Amino acid sequence: MTDADVDPIQPLDVSELSDGWAEECDVLVIGLGAAGLASSIAAAEAGASVIALDRSGGGGTSASAGGILYLGGGTSTQVEAGLSDTAEEMRAFLAEALGRDIDDPRLVAYCEGGVEHHDWLVAHGVPFEPAFWDEPGMEPPGTEGLIYSGGEDASPYRQHHRPVARGHVPATPNAAGWFLVERLREALERTAATVLTDQRAERLVVDGGRVVGATVRADGTVRAIRANSGVVLACGGWAYNEALLAKYAPKLLDIAWRLGTDGDDGWALRTTLGLGAEIEGMSTMEVAVPVTPPRSVVRGVIVNGEGERFINEDTYFGHVGQAILRDQDGVAWLLTDEPNYVVNRVGMRAENVCETWEELAGEIGLPPEKLAATMAAYNEAAARGQDPQFHKAAEWLVPLDTAPFGAIDLRVATILYAGFPLGGTRIDEHARVVRPDGSPIDGLFAAGRAASSLALAHYCSGISLGEGTFFGRRAVAEMFSTREVLNLK
């Protein structure tokens, strides 16, 4: 990557098309991950002519994701699982968890449309088992369709909001992201949409300030495709553009695994910048620490390089990873004792084992007296079922006082963290790409990681797929003013 890889990609004026338009449609969708598939389906079912293209075979990062969709407000899956929820409760929680204003129109639209969007997904072949997995973790062990996926049941949120599970997991024993994409792909195949793979969009085409199409490269030739109603960018983010990462989110360059594909090269971001779009949340990131239940992991203690706790261990694993990378210079250790040690799901083991906390501290390079004091204070409070420092739930509090003691290495430099940037092109509640003054760029829409996330502070698993598919459809509703036809608010 070079400095040129951060430069805006300027649009092409329609007058510069030497060969005119090779193809024409109502809606041009660029990218066929979950967001692009949802947008393409919605447009085709609304009666529009659709050309949907992807630089590879489709699926994108969505196909390799965990498949969770963050939905709520009282979905049928929630109700059948015995859980109650409202759009207002969902919005209040997400406003705090994601760092959005509670009256942000985009957040309001997403929460108020959650039930309808859930039903649309189900109607298009994405089932959810009405069963609730109530323990911390990245995903349920079976086909349970509901999980806590944003620390809803942990501090600080449980002090302010009634915990509600909103992470909806498609009913499949494994590879839920791939399953979601396949079901949406099958739904798209039942429409009249034209699907083009191995075709790369190069530049958007404008006419008098309106986006009217794009140039596309395939098999060494470039042609122009006209879009009479609008262009939807759903072609991924910028996790694999190291020049953009260095400029906006340099800490992501320190982790071993950036979630994405080579399609996450920042093309959508650079293209919208070329049209004067506003960007937001560029330093915000999701970073997952690869420590998952069993319970023993949550019952352990996480300390930084000074031997001090800095977070409640029962919270969402993305919050833990973000705190380690952003606030602790990438240094952390998970401490446990003999009765509570079990190898966690990803096989991480306590490589350092000692008879005292002081000895363990010396072995892993922490201040012995400080670590001993940390553990003494924690154990004393845990014996009373309390955590006055970080308010870990009582069910996960046990004294760690039975030798030998072990340390699992959570340092960013030594284990496989996974993450991706959440910032990007700002869109409004109708998925329109907007300028810094809030005015929309006519004819241009974005969804998924081609747009900025709702998450401006912290992340909740399922937001990317949830908002991507939701705003992919929302773009179509705005193009055709078919909110009633599509049953969108």
What label would you give each PLM region?
Residues 109-222, 242-243, 385-407:
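Conserved redox-cofactor binding core of oxidoreductases
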